[in-house]
């Protein structure tokens, strides 16, 4: 019987022959069969041995296709299935990992957002007066006053909170602490760092007692600073925020300077817009009626207002003066330049200057009209006086002739 099997096996390919010889020459005991993992799987990734044996059984007329042939065939199927058992058993574990993966990702994302929120420092800028007495403000807040590090004298920095100052070292962190910083400028701007929105009024009242020229409507703006000690570069920028390795008092002064100028420039820009609108209405009436009813006093008031705005922007705001801190350290110079571009200070001043020139042109034009009107009145007065003098002369001549 083995000879017939050997003859038949020679007709098969070398791989199949090696497999068949290993099976038929196997000396396994029947008692060892139950130890095999009889796991039938239709998803087996190793179907080649099974397919070979099914073909052999179908075409073979050998009498071994009885108990022994069936036993060997069954053994090989069991072996083939046992090789796929780890794959099949690994699939539920993989599916379980896949089911757990979204939850872990969501948890990591939420933790990342929480860490980002902890490292975020809200910055709020306000403009509600045209002047602040910095000397009296310092006198009443000596315990909160931070001495200046530059020669700039148009602002002061106050720190509130019971925590030790985290900015006395270059690697101090403000985010995640209760430390609050307030930069107050003598021209009326206030910039708050790390202050919650519901606490703003409390800190504005500290300055309000030393302010003059309170405005009927307060201007405000918001920004955000994010600290990241692991940042590869000193600074990264984003939409409505700037990310730094750390934020100290020099950074607070630099950022506060630009935001204070920006919010004040916005206020003055709106004042000039009101003047432009008023002159536009005058020109429209002049176009329709050919005359205007503005008094000389009102015109002079507009001239004075335009000159004051221009002087405040150039002198008080120090719009073209680079911060001393930015001059000394290139890192803060980088912040200063970026924020000026971000808030478009140069472009805003250019627009304001252009509008002021429009106002100046209209003022000069209206002054000429008023001057011509005054000249015409004087001319008529002179004509009347000359006429009266001629009339008196004729009267005297008539009396003398009589």
Curated annotation (Swiss-Prot):
Domain of life: Eukaryota
Phenotype of gene-disrupted mutants: Decreased abscisic acid (ABA) sensitivity during seed germination and seedling growth. Abnormal mitochondria extensively internally vacuolated and characterized by a reduced ABA-stimulated reactive oxygen species (ROS) production associated with the inhibition of ABA-induced AOX1a and ABI4 gene expression.
Listed name of the protein: Protein RETARDED ROOT GROWTH-LIKE
Organism from which the protein derives: Arabidopsis thaliana
Family recorded in the similarity comment: Belongs to the RMD1/sif2 family.
A matching Pfam family: DUF155
Role summary: Mediates abscisic acid (ABA) signal transduction through mitochondrial retrograde regulation involving ABI4 during seed germination and seedling growth, and leading to the production of reactive oxygen species (ROS) by the alternative respiratory pathway. Required for the maintenance of mitochondrial structure.
Positions of disulphide bridges: none
Transmembrane segments: 375-395
Tissue: Highly expressed in germinating seeds and developing seedlings. Also present at low levels in seedlings, roots, leaves, stems and flowers, and barely in siliques.
């Amino acid at each position: 019987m083995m000879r017939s099997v050997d003859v038949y096996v020679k007709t098969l390919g070398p791989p199949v022959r090696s497999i068949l010889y290993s099976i038929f020459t196997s000396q396994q005991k029947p008692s060892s069969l139950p130890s095999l993992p009889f796991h039938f799987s239709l998803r087996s990734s190793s179907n080649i041995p099974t397919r070979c044996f099914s073909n052999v059984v179908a075409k073979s007329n050998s009498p071994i296709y009885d108990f022994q042939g069936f036993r060997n065939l069954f053994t090989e199927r069991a072996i083939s299935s046992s090789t796929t058992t780890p794959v099949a058993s690994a699939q539920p574990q993989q599916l379980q990992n896949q089911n757990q993966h979204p939850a872990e990702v969501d948890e990591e994302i939420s933790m990342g957002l929480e860490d980002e929120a902890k490292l975020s420092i809200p910055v709020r800028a306000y403009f509600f007066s045209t002047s602040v007495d910095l000397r009296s403000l310092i006198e009443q807040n000596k315990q909160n006053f931070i001495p200046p590090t530059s020669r700039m004298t148009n602002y002061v920095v106050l720190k509130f909170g019971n925590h030790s100052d985290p900015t006395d070292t270059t690697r101090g962190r403000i985010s995640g602490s209760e430390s609050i910083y307030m930069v107050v400028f003598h021209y009326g701007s206030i910039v708050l760092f790390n202050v919650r929105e519901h606490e703003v009024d409390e800190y504005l009242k500290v300055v309000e007692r030393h302010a003059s020229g309170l405005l009927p409507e307060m201007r405000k703006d918001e920004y955000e600073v994010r600290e990241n000690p692991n940042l590869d570069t000193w600074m990264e920028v984003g939409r409505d925020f700037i990310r730094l390795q750390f934020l100290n008092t020099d950074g607070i002064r630099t950022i506060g300077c630009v935001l204070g100028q920006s919010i004040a420039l916005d206020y003055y820009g709106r004042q000039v817009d009101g003047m432009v609108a008023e002159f536009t209405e005058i020109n429209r009436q002049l176009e329709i009626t050919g005359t205007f009813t503005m008094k000389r006093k009102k015109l002079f008031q507009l001239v004075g207002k335009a000159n004051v705005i221009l002087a405040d922007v150039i002198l008080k705001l120090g719009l073209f003066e680079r911060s001393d801190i930015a001059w000394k350290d290139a890192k803060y110079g980088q912040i200063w330049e970026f924020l000026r571009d971000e808030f478009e200070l140069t472009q805003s001043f250019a627009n304001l200057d252009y509008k002021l020139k429009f106002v100046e042109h209209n003022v000069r034009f209206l002054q000429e009209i008023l001057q011509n009107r005054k000249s015409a009145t004087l001319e008529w007065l002179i004509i009347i006086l000359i006429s009266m003098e001629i009339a008196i002369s004729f009267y005297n001549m008539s009396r003398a002739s009589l």
